[in-house]
């Protein structure tokens, strides 16, 4: 007789092959038809709110691995919180103004852009941005990210723009906005000012020169400066020294040079000079002395500055207030002129004399040659150093003094208020607080004006009579009213008389004829106002629960948001901030096209499915820098297969099981009680990790639970009972009851991550109660399922099991047995406690060890917890269950079966 037909073999439509690439789009279609986002929200109406506010990515290209990771992390949080019973909306947004988009449009339009009006350029930018909003929206949806995709927030939306202008008005009203001729980061390529957050640092090769400035009033005496920007020397008006440092006058070939004593050895080594120290004095003794500029007919004042260091150079710092932030502040203190003879394209103006018309980078060489001819050059060489570059065009930038609009970060104690609010926020990881605190403490005033057309216009006007440029609250109010109906294009379209109220007067001369100015706001103002435009104005919970972005946003969106919010509302816009690191390749290198190590999320999704990408995101300790590559993704494919196979085994063995078949805890078999108790521990630990946003710990725990504790242990042990015992016997139903609870918990714990796979499993499972798994609630820890004494006893049993498995493996190597069911095990515990446990559970040891026979007796091989002997099992092999028994073959009706199998087949074993 073929006994295979009498076994309870697994049966499920949940295939071993995932085929996610085909199935996922089908599920997305189904979710769209059921309007899953609103369906889920409706199911949580009246529940406590959890609001994660989405930081807007730029709508200027396809999503990349960084934006994909960010959105998936947010989606995991939202889905988890929803399952915990929160009303957790998710409104995605896009940053749609600014230089990144205008730069792309400029490149696409080429020379044509010079003939286009501002309104035409803005329309092209708008079209460009909206196109990529649509592209990115579909790409994010394909990742399984659930949100209000039909109603995102866009910074170009007129309603949004009115909120920007209202907050700007608050800043104006509070006196935080001012106009100044200060040096700012300037991109000569993009021809605009940049804020700190728009600056990147890359390696750059620069000339390094030592230059002599002749000291006036002292014969043959020179102050030596060092600079890596020779092109700024035409703007030099001072030399800064540290008041408390020691300086020396050294004799070199009949001349006297002044340098800091702390840098003398380094300076002498680099310049290869022989010298003699003739005098020593403090830096403060040099204050107000004057030196002669080496190639321009003017004097350079010696001034004091605490920022002078002894790291490089000579301790005598070339100072040009028009080309440096610290230089500018020193210039204010000493009433120095602010010279910046460079135009918007980085070309010298007439003010630079003989260098007029030269590009600043080309001028370096000419200036060095002139210094050499004049005998002022001591040494020149090339150095590689970290230098600021434009975030958009990636070209080197400069400091350039131009009239700009600024936000004073100290007016009305704004900086101090922000620092106080930072302390109230919960930062993950904790070092995030120190990082943003240091940045806020050190940050200069905020340059908010941009010389571009694609942005929110700064409603500043210029008096036609005296040239005064100013901002009037009445003009802002008038413009806001217009923007509500027409958008900010109106600033570029409408004549002044339709925007500027008649009663506006010039604060300087009293006249009332004006023209508009056309600077636009820094885009960090735009996105920094999202707390008002998206949250407060719509009556959402404020402050929100969470901001979650890359750690570069400590100087970006986190900072712009808290400054705007504190200025407007007096408090931080967020309760908690979670940051993730930068994404690098699997070797820790930055991704770049030239290295060929760029990982495209679309390629992963198209090849493996979005759930594989999501599983990878859950696997990373994202608080640190993140690594990804083809090998790492392939590892996730293997992990996914193990998780999927665990789900498949559970589903296959629950195919005929319903909730009516559940066995009460007290009636469960001991092994099943242990497994159910262990499940409660897993649920508790997984929940704790989710709460702390430690998704990599969730991943590791569930991965180990599925592969080691379930597939390789508990489920492996259960196969005999599941397949061999009677379909509805207590032996099988006890196992199925626990498998039911495990499947329920596993699907729910994995649902925030494997959104597609868990949906597929849920639809085929006996635990389905809702139309989608994503309407389900989080599994609860049930203490009534934990028998503490039994859990401790099984801890001992599994330690003994490890010793038994080692002994079985040795027996297999020595050809004593083939399969473990060929074995008889004799064992005893190494102490009385272990032995008592073995005796107590002796009737279950065959099952736990997956052997045919177990005897409590003297084992020959010493183990850590038990002494174990393995020999060939006695009797004959049952053709149905493959276990050996001396009673096998004695049943006439079912020959070749053991007594247990014969009883099952006769319906006698229930």
From Swiss-Prot:
Motif ('KMSKS' region): 590-594
Organism: Thermosipho africanus (strain TCF52B)
Cofactor(s) the record lists: Zn(2+)
Subunit (UniProt): Monomer.
Note on domains (UniProt): IleRS has two distinct active sites: one for aminoacylation and one for editing. The misactivated valine is translocated from the active site to the editing site, which sterically excludes the correctly activated isoleucine. The single editing site contains two valyl binding pockets, one specific for each substrate (Val-AMP or Val-tRNA(Ile)).
Pfam family, one: Anticodon_1
Gene behind the chain: ileS
One GO location term (cellular component): cytosol
Protein name per Swiss-Prot or TrEMBL: Isoleucine--tRNA ligase
GO molecular function, one term: ATP binding
Motif annotated as 'HIGH' region, chain positions: 57-67
Residues binding ATP: 593
Gene3D superfamilies: 1.10.730.20, HUPs, Ile-tRNA synthetase CP2 domain-like
The protein's Enzyme Commission number: 6.1.1.5
Function summary: Catalyzes the attachment of isoleucine to tRNA(Ile). As IleRS can inadvertently accommodate and process structurally similar amino acids such as valine, to avoid such errors it has two additional distinct tRNA(Ile)-dependent editing activities. One activity is designated as 'pretransfer' editing and involves the hydrolysis of activated Val-AMP. The other activity is designated 'posttransfer' editing and involves deacylation of mischarged Val-tRNA(Ile).
Co-factor remark: Binds 1 zinc ion per subunit.
Protein family according to the UniProt entry: Belongs to the class-I aminoacyl-tRNA synthetase family. IleS type 1 subfamily.
Positions of L-isoleucyl-5'-AMP binding: 549
Broad enzyme group: ligase
Keywords, comma-separated and alphabetical: Aminoacyl-tRNA synthetase, ATP-binding, Cytoplasm, Ligase, Metal-binding, Nucleotide-binding, Protein biosynthesis, Zinc
Keyword Glycosyltransferase: no
Reaction catalysis annotation: tRNA(Ile) + L-isoleucine + ATP = L-isoleucyl-tRNA(Ile) + AMP + diphosphate
Subcellular localization, as worded in the UniProt entry: Cytoplasm
GO annotation (BP), single: isoleucyl-tRNA aminoacylation
Binding-site list for Zn(2+): 878, 881, 898, 901
